[in-house]
Amino acid sequence: MASPALISETEAWKDLKAHLEGIKMTHLRELMGDTERCQSMMVEFDNIFLDYSRQQASPDTISKLYKLADEAHLKQKIDRMYNGDHINTTENRSVLHVALRAPRNSAICSDGKNVVPDVWSVLDKIKDFSDRVRNGSWIGATGKELKDVIAVGIGGSFLGPLFVHTALQTDPEASKNARGRELRFLANVDPIDVARNISGLNPETTLVVVVSKTFTTAETMLNARTLREWISSALGPSAVAKHMVAVSTNLPLVEKFGIDPNNAFAFWDWVGGRYSVCSAVGVLPLSLQYGFAVVEKFLQGAHSIDQHFSSAPFEKNIPVLLGLLSVWNVSFLGYPARAILPYSQALEKLAPHIQQVSMESNGKGVSVDGLPLPFESGEIDFGEPGTNGQHSFYQLIHQGRVIPCDFIGVVKSQQPVYLKGEVVNNHDELMSNFFAQPDALAYGKTPEELKKENVSEHLIPHKTFTGNRPSISILLPTLDAYRIGQVLAIYEHRVAVQGFVWGINSFDQWGVELGKSLATQVRKQLHGSRVKGEPVEEGFNFSTKTLLTRYLQATSDVPADPSTLLPNII
């Protein structure tokens, strides 16, 4: 008998639906009172401790989720990914970001070819180049050392590397290696982003890394041309070859741009943009800033989770457990959002990166076979570090909509602070909140408890907390390069698990394309109106035509053929 076309047609899905009502009637106060249950919902791998006991789930729920995973052929799908099968079916590609952090002697194949030697060829090239820049043997056009780097890219070429960079900035080893150096990321085509990136920098000491697989990404290439003009206007056109390098596979366009093809670093079609931080996209700028040795530890951390994900049984498998619980929260309990709440300022860019990884991967409305999904999938991801978020949006999480939360804590701070006479040190103050918030969400506060505290009758409705709000807690021993790699890989694989269970393609992003094609029409209109004075055509709807006309009229002082003008900011 053929497998059902949709996971929602399986017996395991229907069983979970039937199981749902009993769980909804059981409060987390009751579930948390079962010590045996709580112990069964704690998992440890490599000193990473996961506690999912504050999920609205019983041991029976978890067993039923394992059955759902079996009916979704989760293990087989994971194996197919690692084996290089073309699981990105709409683009007919392998999905092998795990190969980017595999040890040199590994064998991971795509289309019958072991891709690991190619990966390490690029990594060796990055190490050699970054070492030469850092030790001063590669210098700029005027003989000065290149101390500042601007990485130009957008989407996955920006968010992932920015997350890792921000996380490493205050790590003792990484910060020591980065002393006297600066790394910036230029992503938005908004000229304000250009101005902010070049502010305070000297073209003589700046190296630009242009990240575009095809070297045709509209926003990235306009920003790259802008920085090329910034460099050449100060140092002459010939300086571009010494001050700009590329991460791309389109060597003819790289050379045409003015960059020596020998200074181009490759990556491959089997690397999706949002999964590319472990390729030259992230490794090159991060190695220039922190040295290759630090970045290699980051890759090793990610690889440790890759091994764990591919080999650990589901009941001990952190990404699998997290992915299954997300499916439970989204598709059964009906919670559309998730808050990522790291109690470490170093992880402040984790949520924006995972927002892209998750929402671009699983923001789909059809199955891999093109069938409309009759259930909710995908999550709205957001977050801020604690305790900042507590003074921002936690109000809604406590007393408004139910939003499952990921609390991430670190045992040892990157930068400990102790003040004589204080009740606790700074990190303990932070962690006090990390431990308290999940319980506040789970237990809440009842009217009866408030009455015992002699709270005024008219305030009781306002001070009542319903509780029963799910969360997971992850406790990391430290936050160094290795652990940062582990955090990245846990979330990458969690997203894949969700997509595998839902039966969607988590590795394409056709939703990005429609807006791009419509922007081409607008770009053509803006050019025609600026240069030839053409009125806005009838091809636009009334609303867009009105907005475009208003914009053009208000910016009529923009010259049709302007002289080059670069941002003027000190």
Curated annotation (Swiss-Prot):
Its EC number is 5.3.1.9. It is found in: Cytoplasm. GO terms for cellular component: cytosol. Homodimer. It catalyses: alpha-D-glucose 6-phosphate = beta-D-fructose 6-phosphate. It comes from Clarkia rostrata. It is an enzyme of class 5 (isomerase). Keywords: Cytoplasm, Gluconeogenesis, Glycolysis, Isomerase. Belongs to the GPI family. It comes from the Eukaryota. GO terms for biological process: gluconeogenesis; glucose 6-phosphate metabolic process; glycolytic process. The active site is at E360, H391, K516. The keyword Isomerase applies. CDD domains: SIS_PGI_1, SIS_PGI_2. This is Glucose-6-phosphate isomerase, cytosolic 1. Its main location: cytoplasm. The lineage of its organism: Eukaryota, Viridiplantae, Streptophyta, Embryophyta, Tracheophyta. The keyword Isomerase applies. InterPro entries: G6P_Isomerase (IPR001672), G6P_Isomerase_C (IPR023096), Phosphoglucose_isomerase_CS (IPR018189), SIS_dom_sf (IPR046348), SIS_PGI_1 (IPR035476), SIS_PGI_2 (IPR035482). GO terms for molecular function: carbohydrate derivative binding; glucose-6-phosphate isomerase activity; monosaccharide binding. Pathway: Carbohydrate degradation; glycolysis; D-glyceraldehyde 3-phosphate and glycerone phosphate from D-glucose: step 2/4.
